[in-house]
Amino acid sequence: AALGMDHVWARILSVYGPHDGPNTMISATIQKLLAGQCPDLTAGEQKWDYLYSADAADALYRMACHGRSGAVYAVGSGTARPLREYIETLRDAIDLSLPLGLGKIPYGPQQVMFLQADITQLAADTGFAPRTAFADGIRATIAWAKTQKQTN
């Protein structure tokens, strides 16, 4: 390690959960649906890798304790699913009857269509494995969002 300092580098992909910023796709969609509004979305064909925030914190902790100095680790769930599936799971956790505006927004010219972390090295070096299924994490995130709505 240069200068006697160990370091690891985290490449954090898409993390969601309580305390997320209001302008992320997940947070904005939750807020629209909780308000009974139809969110305007792309068709949702992008394949995406979402990781619950508590799992991301666990990955970072494990990197600090067990990571190889100088290593670069991708932090994600390691699994990509169509964005449409995440959005439908989110909606279903709020109210199955709410409409989704899938396809109302066109893809941008720079739209990323596939994002997935390769967590092979992270798992091998640190023992990290995501523990929270998206459906469970999104329910916790929605519960938190409801408390924010009541306090604002």
Spans of model-derived segments:
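Non-catalytic, surface-exposed connector residues within folded enzymatic/regulatory domains
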Residues: 6-9, 23, 84
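Short beta-loop-alpha junction of Rossmann-like oxidoreductase domains
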Residues: 18-24
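C-terminal substrate-binding subdomain of Rossmann-fold SDR/epimerase-dehydratase oxidoreductases
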Residues: 27, 33-152
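Conserved beta-loop-beta element that borders a ligand/cofactor-binding pocket
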Residues: 1-18
